[in-house]
Amino acid sequence: MNRKEISKVVDLVRESNPLVHNITNVVVTNFTANGLLALGASPVMAYAKEEVAEMASIAGALVLNMGTLRPEEVEAMLLAGKSANVNNVPVLFDPVGAGATSYRTEVARHIPAEIELAIIRGNAAEIANVINERWEIKGVDAGAGNGNVVSIAKQAADELNTVAVITGKEDVVTDGQRTIVIRNGHPILTKVTGTGCLLTSVIGAFVAVEKDYVKAAVAALTFYGVAAELAAAKTVEKGPGSFQIEFLNQLANTTSGDIEKYGEIEVI
């Protein structure tokens, strides 16, 4: 897997304009929709249990994000996820804050038990808590801790029969057999709420057009990281507000050529 190979997926997303169904949290809904639109995908935010199964059945990908967790949304996620499975629509799960509370952790473990996942994406603490491995967490954005990130990712991929994506200073993608590290991105991403949640939805757009989910995830992470680097180069001295706006611009303007030029990936 090389930069030229993954760069082609960016063009495919823009040519295909995939429909990404998001059941996400109230903090990030607007940013997620705008980010997907900038990229070239078509977002839909449908939450009502009366319609989620139908909407999921016609989507290119379904993204389940449990950031602002409520029982009615969990019910909707399960209905949508099972419909997506029946209709061969890939499901992505973002277990935001898994490990922070007992209820949140219970839901984070219940959803993968009920729904076949194409991708699970979170920080190291979240993924570790989903698979019941010890990892300290403080708040929903905690990611630092003691442990081997690659090992946790591989264990999650094996136990959940999915592609595991752990994001942080370096990003890890694995299906348990193939493991790739991506080293693109910028620290200012942590100063804008919703950048991790948007990332999961961006991976959804890539998964909708590329059935090799490892390749799709690596392409999405590299694209996202390069876009962040280009945006930061123009705005980092101004601050996170300016960065957020420019990041949306770069999601629209970052090309496959930029991926080939700036992408930093390593197969391990």
Curated annotation (Swiss-Prot):
Q: In which pathway does it act?
A: Cofactor biosynthesis; thiamine diphosphate biosynthesis; 4-methyl-5-(2-phosphoethyl)-thiazole from 5-(2-hydroxyethyl)-4-methylthiazole: step 1/1
* E.C. designation(s): 2.7.1.50
Look up the record and give one Gene Ontology term from the biological process aspect.
thiamine diphosphate biosynthetic process
Which species does the entry assign this protein to? Bacillus cereus (strain AH187)
List, in alphabetical order, the Gene Ontology terms for molecular function in this entry: ATP binding; hydroxyethylthiazole kinase activity; magnesium ion binding
Look up the record and name the cofactor or cofactors this protein needs: Mg(2+)
Query: Under what name is this protein listed?
Result: Hydroxyethylthiazole kinase
Q: Any idea what job this protein has?
A: Catalyzes the phosphorylation of the hydroxyl group of 4-methyl-5-beta-hydroxyethylthiazole (THZ).
